Amino acid sequence: MTLSPEDLKTIEKYAYQNAVKYGKAPQPKAVMGKVMGECPQLRSDPNAVSEALKVIIPEIAKGNPETWETKLSEIAPELIEALSVKKEPDKGLKPLEGAENGKVVMRFAPNPNGPATLGSARGMVVNSEYVKMYGGKFVLRFDDTDPDIKRPLLQAYDWYLDDFKWLGVVPDQVVYASDHFPMYYDYARKLIEMGKAYVCFCKGGDFKRFKDAKQSCPHRDTSPEENLMHWEKMLAGEYEDQQAVLRIKTDIKHKDPALRDWGAFRIRKMSHPRPEIGNKYVVWPLLDFAGAIEDHELGMTHIIRGKDLIDSEKRQGYIYKYFGWKYPRTTNWGRVKIHEFGKFSTSTLRKAIEAGEYSGWDDPRLPTIRAIRRRGIQAEALKKFMIEMGVGMTDVSISMESLYAENRKIVDPIANRYFFVWNPVELEITDAEPTVAKLPLHPTDHKRGFREIAVGNKVLVCTEDVEKLEVGSIIRLKDFCNIEITSLSPLQAKLSDVSLEALKKAKAKIIHWAPLDGINVKVRGPEGDLNGIGEQGIAAELDKIVQFERFGFCRIDAVSEDEIVAYFAHK
C-alpha cells in the first residue's frame, strides 16, 4: 500500500511523541507499536510503516529534546498534553532499588552559573530526602568546569549553600569539581595509554561529517605514544583555543550518533571565576567526563537525573567499562513544567538580569528559590511540593497554586492580620466621633491580642470597592462600624444602626480600611508593584509573614520611616 500524506503525518507525530517522552531519538519498535495500536488502517502493511520510519527517525534524531517538544506542540499539541501529569503526579518517594540502610550515597550536582531555581529544587529536595530515608551520605558537588557557555557565578556557590541551610539540609560533603583538574588529567592519561582516548584536530564540522558517516577521522588510529605527546602539549598551552579535543574512543558505527567518539576535554584559554583556579588551566573537562570520574571517586550508589541525560549514562558507560567500574543505579525523571513560568533556563535568566529586566536573582517575578523565599514561601511547603511530584519518567505539568496551598497551611495559623488599602480613596463618616478601633491580630486566636487604631471621622478605602457602591448602600467597615453611603462625590457616609446580624443576613458588603495617618506600603509581587496605605502596626512585623486582609499573605521585607516594603506570597 502507498501511505497517504495523512498517514505519514500520523507516523511522524507518534515518532516525535516517543522522542519527547524519553528524551532521545525515537525507538522504531515502540513507535511502530503505537502507530499500529492507534491506527487500524495501517495494520495491513507494517512494512510500509517500517520503511517510513527509516526516513522519519533519522531526521528527528538530528534534533534535541527542546526542538522535539517545540515540533510536537506544533503538529500534535494533544500528544504533549497526554505526556503531562496535570493534578496528581506520582506522589511520594518510592523505595530506591537496591538501597541498603547506611550505605546509600547520593549527590546533587548543580552548575553554579546562577542560584537554585525551582527546577533545581526538585533535585535538592528529593536526593537529600532519600539519603535521610536510608541514613546515607549526601554530597553537594558543584559541576563548575564550564568556563564560557555556562560560566560559574561566584556568588552562586554560597547561594546554594544558603538555600540548603534554609531547607534544613547540611550536605555531608561539599565538592568543587574545579578543584580536581589534576585527577581528571591523570585518568585521561590512563585512557590514552589504554588506547581508549585520542587527540583529535578535526574542525567541528569536519568531525561531524565523519561521525554522521560512521567513519573514523584521520586522528582516531594515532598511537597512544603520539596521543600522549599531543596531550601534554594541550596541557602546556601549545595549541590554540579549540584546536584540539580529547575524545573517548567508543563505537564509531554506533546507531546513536551522540555516542560516537564523544568529546571529553577541550582547550579554552579563559579564567575561572574562583580565585583558587583563575588562569591555572587551559584544558577543560566536559561534563560527561568529569561527572563520570566524580561519581566513581565519591562512591555514588544511586543517581537521579533528568531523562534528557539518558545519553550521558551511555557515554559515561564506556569509561566505566574501560576501568572495570560498576555504574551507579540510575533513575531518570521527566521534566517539570510550572504553568506560571513556562520554559526558563538559568542562562537566559542571567542575561535578563544583566540587561536590567529584573532587579536581581530574588526579583519576585523569577522562579528562583531566593525569590520565593523573599516572598514568604516556607521551606517545608517547598519540600512537600517537590516530594509529591514523585520520581517518574512522565513529564509533570503543575501549577504554583499547589505550592501556595501547602504554604497556606503553614502560614495561615501564624500570620497576624492587618489592613492594606491599595489605590486609596478618602471616605468621610459625617457623624462619627473620634474613637479607637480594636481589631484582633488573628481571627481565631484572640489570645494573641489586638491591634488598636485611632480613628477620626475619615478613613481610606480601596477604589475598586467604591466603584461598586451606590447612594443608600449599607456596608460594614470590617471590625469597626456599619455605615450608609450618602454621597459618592465626595465620598461620604453616616453611621448606620443596622445590626451586624441583619447585615450578614442581607449579605451586605464588608470592606477593609486604613486610617488617614497610616504608613505608605509598597507590595512587590509577580505582577509588579502595588502602592497603598497600611496600618502603623505592620512596621513591627519585619521579616515576618502577615496577611493583608482581602489581599493576601505577604512577607515584610523592609521598614523605614517613610515606607514599608512587602513581598506578595499568594492569596
From Swiss-Prot:
Gene Ontology biological process: amide biosynthetic process; glutamyl-tRNA aminoacylation
Protein origin, superkingdom: Archaea
Motif ('HIGH' region): 110-120
Localization annotation: Cytoplasm
Keywords tagged on the record: Aminoacyl-tRNA synthetase, ATP-binding, Cytoplasm, Ligase, Nucleotide-binding, Protein biosynthesis
Molecular function terms from GO: ATP binding; glutamate-tRNA ligase activity
Catalytic activity reported: tRNA(Glu) + L-glutamate + ATP = L-glutamyl-tRNA(Glu) + AMP + diphosphate
Pfam families named in the record: tRNA-synt_1c, tRNA-synt_1c_C
One CC-aspect GO term: cytosol
E.C. code: 6.1.1.17
Purpose: Catalyzes the attachment of glutamate to tRNA(Glu) in a two-step reaction: glutamate is first activated by ATP to form Glu-AMP and then transferred to the acceptor end of tRNA(Glu).
Family: Belongs to the class-I aminoacyl-tRNA synthetase family. Glutamate--tRNA ligase type 2 subfamily.
HAMAP family, per the entry: Glu_tRNA_synth_type2 (MF_02076)
Protein name listed in UniProt: Glutamate--tRNA ligase
Naturally occurring in which organism (per UniProt): Methanosarcina barkeri (strain Fusaro / DSM 804)
